[in-house]
């Protein structure tokens, strides 16, 4: 099916929002211009809504295989499509871990059969993510590994991390890291700060993250490897990443929507839906994340979509697993709380969620360019809705944002020229 999207707006090559039509033919973007006509295409009236590149998320947890009670490839990718994401990169903390040919082939088969959006799987750095034996990077790359990570845990052994970085560099691949120094975690469930002190909880200190990043940056410099830092959350982390970039070290970084919108002061009670890793930090950390995003220290926004069951989250803040869902709330949360408040521009938000992650990892995504695959999301910037977890397509309803009123909701998502999700009665 060919589609002609009429009377929309998009961000052009100069980074400006302008009026446009967009023609999709044979799964590709055929033309982006005003006043397009086409005889062989279904016309979809966009009514002034934003036509954006499909959003790109380099940090997601789909849970399958092994955690299908939390999420499946089918439910997770439907939720991604509803959130406007067309390319997502799935973390390897599944059971089994994609750490060998057999496991990666099985994962790719599942993705091919079930995914509603483009899914690029990470390969594990170590076997079973246990930190003691390196995986076969060459085989995992051959089978389509997006990059290498042991996300969910930090690689504690510096010699293992250095060897992994050297091997990845030879393959022109990135090493992506969840950064925690295990000896400093302190059995914490929240940030070590005012909230932990008030409620008598063990806290995770900020330096637990930043010291690990500092170590890895020096290892990346020695290995000449592209090193990407997951979910940056502290002022100290921003500082060491900024210094590394100024020194010419190949380091990039991401931040989550929840760390951009919330800090520990916003946690209303010992609610496990506010428990994530890294935890919500202090006000100064939150300000540093915004500053780092604006000055280029932090390159992109990624959701760290981490679904869990209601039963798991009901165990209380100390026992409940870390993580919140992110796909279906990311864009409206960021648009309402950053763009509408004048902290960043709409153009910047689009870039942080599309071209910046795509360019960082060399993906042919993130831009509406003629000849490229038609991965598109259409967003109604005026639509206001209350976040209601009962309407999530994700199995995970674990969000701290229930009841928040937000503007800027995706109404249609196109993947490979086909409609992957559409809000009922969204377009005429």
From Swiss-Prot:
Keywords: Hydrolase, Metal-binding, Pyrimidine biosynthesis, Zinc
Reactions listed under catalytic activity: (S)-dihydroorotate + H2O = N-carbamoyl-L-aspartate + H(+)
Active site: 304
SUPFAM superfamilies: Composite domain of metallo-dependent hydrolases (SSF51338), Metallo-dependent hydrolases (SSF51556)
GO biological process, one term: purine nucleobase catabolic process
Cofactor binding notes: Binds 2 Zn(2+) ions per subunit.
Cofactor entry: Zn(2+)
One Pfam short name: Amidohydro_1
Keyword Methyltransferase on entry: no
Entry keyword annotation includes Zinc: yes
GO MF terms held by the record: allantoinase activity; dihydroorotase activity; zinc ion binding
Annotated EC: 3.5.2.3
Disulphide bond pairs: none
Superkingdom as given in the UniProt entry: Bacteria
Family named by the database record: Belongs to the metallo-dependent hydrolases superfamily. DHOase family. Class I DHOase subfamily.
Function, in words: Catalyzes the reversible cyclization of carbamoyl aspartate to dihydroorotate.
Name of the protein in its database record: Dihydroorotase
Source organism: Bacillus cereus (strain G9842)
Lineage: Bacteria, Bacillati, Bacillota, Bacilli, Bacillales
């Amino acid at each position: 099916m060919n589609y002609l999207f009429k009377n929309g707006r998009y961000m052009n090559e100069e980074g400006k929002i302008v009026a446009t039509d967009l023609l999709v033919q044979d799964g590709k973007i055929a033309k982006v211009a005003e006043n397009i006509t086409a005889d062989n295409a279904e016309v979809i009236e966009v009514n002034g809504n934003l036509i954006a590149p499909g959003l790109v998320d380099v940090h997601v947890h789909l849970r399958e295989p092994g955690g299908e009670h939390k999420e499946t490839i089918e439910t997770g990718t439907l939720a991604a499509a509803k959130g406007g994401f067309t390319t997502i990169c799935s973390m390897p903390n599944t059971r089994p871990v994609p750490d060998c040919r057999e496991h990666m082939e099985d994962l790719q088969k599942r993705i091919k059969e079930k995914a509603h959006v483009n899914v690029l799987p990470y390969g594990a750095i170590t076997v079973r993510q246990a930190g003691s034996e390196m995986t076969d990077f060459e085989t995992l790359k051959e089978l389509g590994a997006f990059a290498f990570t042991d996300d969910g845990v930090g690689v504690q052994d510096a010699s293992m991390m250095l060897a992994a970085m050297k091997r990845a560099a030879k393959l022109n691949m990135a090493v992506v890291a969840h950064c925690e120094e295990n000896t400093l975690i302190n059995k914490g469930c929240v940030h070590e700060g005012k909230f932990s002190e008030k409620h008598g909880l063990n806290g995770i200190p900020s330096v637990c993250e930043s010291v690990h990043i500092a170590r890895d940056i020096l290892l990346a410099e020695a290995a000449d490897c592209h090193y990407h830092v997951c979910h940056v959350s502290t002022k100290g982390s921003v500082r060491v990443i900024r210094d590394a970039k100024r020194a010419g070290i190949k380091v990039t970084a991401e931040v989550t929507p929840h760390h951009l919108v919330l800090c520990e002061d916003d946690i209303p009670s010992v609610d496990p839906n506010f428990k994530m890793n890294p935890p919500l930090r202090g006000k100064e950390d939150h300000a540093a994340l915004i500053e780092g995003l604006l000055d280029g220290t932090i390159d992109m926004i990624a959701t760290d979509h981490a679904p869990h069951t209601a039963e798991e989250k009901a165990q209380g803040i100390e026992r409940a697993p870390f993580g919140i869902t992110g796909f279906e709330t990311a864009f409206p949360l960021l648009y309402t709380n950053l763009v509408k408040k004048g902290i960043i521009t709409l153009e910047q938000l689009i870039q942080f969620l599309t071209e910046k992650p795509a360019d960082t990892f060399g993906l042919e995504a993130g831009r509406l360019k003629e000849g490229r695959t038609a991965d598109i999301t259409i967003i109604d910037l005026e639509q206001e809705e209350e976040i209601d977890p009962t309407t999530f397509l994700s199995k995970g309803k674990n969000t701290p944002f229930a009841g928040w009123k937000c503007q800027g909701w995706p109404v249609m998502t196109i993947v490979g020229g086909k409609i992957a999700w559409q809000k009922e009665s969204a377009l005429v």
